[in-house]
């Protein structure tokens, strides 16, 4: 576990200062930030979160309020700030006692469906840096998370690597039947953050997992999946190239 701990994703090699500082214009809310109040950060005219902080999956583009917003001066906490506030639930790193699986994360208390677990935080890096690190750490576990989106019909990829700098999110294991999922959130800037939310109610002591995605690897290079769920696909999802 030799890495630098950070609270949220930071810019790394391959990400220009201009791209990282491409921020949204903030809202001018003087009261609660909600769709009913006309908060400009809620561009879908739908609240991103319920009053008790659960994710509203009807929101197609999740933009949280930020330091550019007038609501930062409000005496009460803005309802449209969840991912940026970090984990609010007790999370525990533990040894899974399986050498191939290593460490994992479990719930230290009950987590309700839709509640925020943690961000998958690391360095936001460029494609060339992804490929360079893949060569440098060849044979080691690959921590890089590829966030895939489409804008104007064109694919856009964001790479988050917590190998050197990261948070507890780097320890969440894969499951073919996960209790968590990744939802992209924009925390005042165009570059998204990876928020991990509970897909269903989770009991204390239960391991937290999300689905790493579909595999593009066939044959001998595949690794066995150890999730032990009834829907197990037998092999871990793996990309054919570092930037997929």
Curated annotation (Swiss-Prot):
Zn(2+) 4 binds at residues 176, 225, 227, 232. It catalyses: L-lysyl-[histone] + S-adenosyl-L-methionine = N(6)-methyl-L-lysyl-[histone] + S-adenosyl-L-homocysteine + H(+). Its EC number is 2.1.1.-. Residues 25-86 form the Pre-SET domain. Keywords: Chromatin regulator, Chromosome, Developmental protein, Metal-binding, Methyltransferase, Nucleus, S-adenosyl-L-methionine, Transferase, Zinc. S-adenosyl-L-methionine binds at residues 101-103, 141, 143, 170, 173-174. One of its GO terms (biological process) is methylation. It is an enzyme of class 2 (transferase). Zn(2+) 3 binds at residues 33, 65, 71, 78. Disruption phenotype: Embryonic lethal. It is found in: Nucleus; Chromosome. Residues 221-237 form the Post-SET domain. The keyword Nuclease does not apply. It holds the Pfam family SET. One of its GO terms (cellular component) is chromosome. Residues 89-213 form the SET domain. One of its GO terms (molecular function) is histone methyltransferase activity. Zn(2+) 2 binds at residues 27, 41, 65, 69. Zn(2+) 1 binds at residues 27, 29, 33, 39. In the pre-SET domain, Cys residues bind 3 zinc ions that are arranged in a triangular cluster; some of these Cys residues contribute to the binding of two zinc ions within the cluster. Belongs to the class V-like SAM-binding methyltransferase superfamily. Histone-lysine methyltransferase family. Suvar3-9 subfamily. Probable histone methyltransferase. Required for embryonic development. This is Probable histone-lysine N-methyltransferase set-23. The gene is set-23.
């Amino acid at each position: 576990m030799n890495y630098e701990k950070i609270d949220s994703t930071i810019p790394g090699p391959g990400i220009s200062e201009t791209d990282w500082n491409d921020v949204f214009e903030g809202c001018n809310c003087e009261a609660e930030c909600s769709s009913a109040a006309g908060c400009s950060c809620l561009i879908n005219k739908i609240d991103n979160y319920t009053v008790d902080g659960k994710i509203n999956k009807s929101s197609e583009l999740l933009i949280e309020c930020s330091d550019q917003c007038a609501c930062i001066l409000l005496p009460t906490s803005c309802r449209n700030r969840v991912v940026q506030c970090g984990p609010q639930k007790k999370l525990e790193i533990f040894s899974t006692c399986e050498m191939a699986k290593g460490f994992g994360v479990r719930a230290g208390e009950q987590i309700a469906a839709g509640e925020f677990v943690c961000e998958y935080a690391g360095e936001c890096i460029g494609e060339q840096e992804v490929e360079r690190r893949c060569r440098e750490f060849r044979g080691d576990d690959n921590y890089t998370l590829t966030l895939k989106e489409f804008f104007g019909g064109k694919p856009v990829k964001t790479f988050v690597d917590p190998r050197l700098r990261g948070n507890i999110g780097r320890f969440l294991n894969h499951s073919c039947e996960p209790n968590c999922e990744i939802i992209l959130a924009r925390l005042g800037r165009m570059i998204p953050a990876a928020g991990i939310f509970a897909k269903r109610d989770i009991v204390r002591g239960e391991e937290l997992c999300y689905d790493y995605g579909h595999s593009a690897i066939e044959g001998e290079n595949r690794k066995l999946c150890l999730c032990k769920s009834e829907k197990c696909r037998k092999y871990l999802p793996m990309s054919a190239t570092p930037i997929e």
